[in-house]
């Protein structure tokens, strides 16, 4: 997470950490007691789910560990184009809902340009001093604590200028004018929440993220409501 700061602990109670054989792999979002939503590119064979996390290295109290009963990436996911980068995970046993572990609402409408959002994750953060961003002095590292950044929805027209021909209608871009706040490597699969509603899933962007002024690109959740609801019903 670039240009963000440590989140108020448990202020994003739907935030999920996905682990692969004990290593942090991706973010995700709790959307019901049984279901977690993430990006298809986060799929690995031995996914474990951690809920109620803030500091990944410390036991805090509200953490819950879950195994995954079913991993369901979108059937038409394409790694090269990032198309349909969405995946559902069914938990083996339901989350115990609490103040620190709570599902996020799915959207009833699509995000509007300029809408204010929060992106959260345990992805790379920059250690640089102000003014060194993009210089060889710029350093990135993985934080222990969940980070949050305030960004807004970028109009499709300007996002298309940054990524000609690569942004589909089922994607949404978000960032800040001129760059400086963005999701980064390791934030993948995590939530973009606008007005308390899950509007995006961290999908892709310009690499390396600490030297770019281009916005991040997110899977647009409103495009997948049918698929999400159908899949949850059938499984």
Question: What would you call each of these model-derived segments?
Answer:
Residues 11-13, 44-46, 63-68, 84-86, ...:
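Extracytoplasmic
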């Amino acid at each position: 997470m670039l240009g963000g700061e440590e989140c108020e602990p448990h202020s994003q109670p739907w935030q999920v950490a996905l682990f692969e054989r004990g290593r942090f792999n991706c973010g995700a979002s709790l959307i019901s007691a049984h279901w977690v939503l993430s990006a298809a590119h986060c799929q690995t064979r031995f996914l474990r789910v951690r809920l109620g996390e803030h500091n990944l290295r410390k036991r805090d109290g509200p953490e819950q560990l879950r195994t995954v009963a079913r991993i369901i990436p979108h059937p038409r996911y394409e790694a090269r184009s990032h198309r349909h980068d969405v995946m559902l995970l069914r938990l083996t046993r339901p989350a115990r809902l609490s103040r620190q572990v709570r599902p996020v609402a799915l959207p009833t409408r699509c995000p509007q340009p300029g809408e204010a959002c929060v992106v959260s994750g345990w992805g790379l953060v920059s250690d640089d001093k102000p003014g060194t961003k993009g210089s060889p002095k710029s350093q990135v590292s993985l934080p222990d604590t969940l980070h949050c950044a305030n960004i807004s929805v970028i109009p499709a027209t300007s996002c298309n200028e940054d990524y000609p021909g690569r942004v589909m209608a089922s994607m949404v871009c978000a960032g800040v004018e001129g760059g400086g706040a963005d999701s980064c490597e390791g934030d993948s699969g995590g939530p973009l929440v606008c007005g308390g509603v899950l509007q995006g899933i961290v999908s892709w962007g310009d690499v390396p993220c600490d030297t770019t002024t281009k916005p991040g690109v997110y899977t647009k959740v409103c495009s997948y409501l049918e698929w999400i609801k159908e899949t949850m019903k059938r499984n």
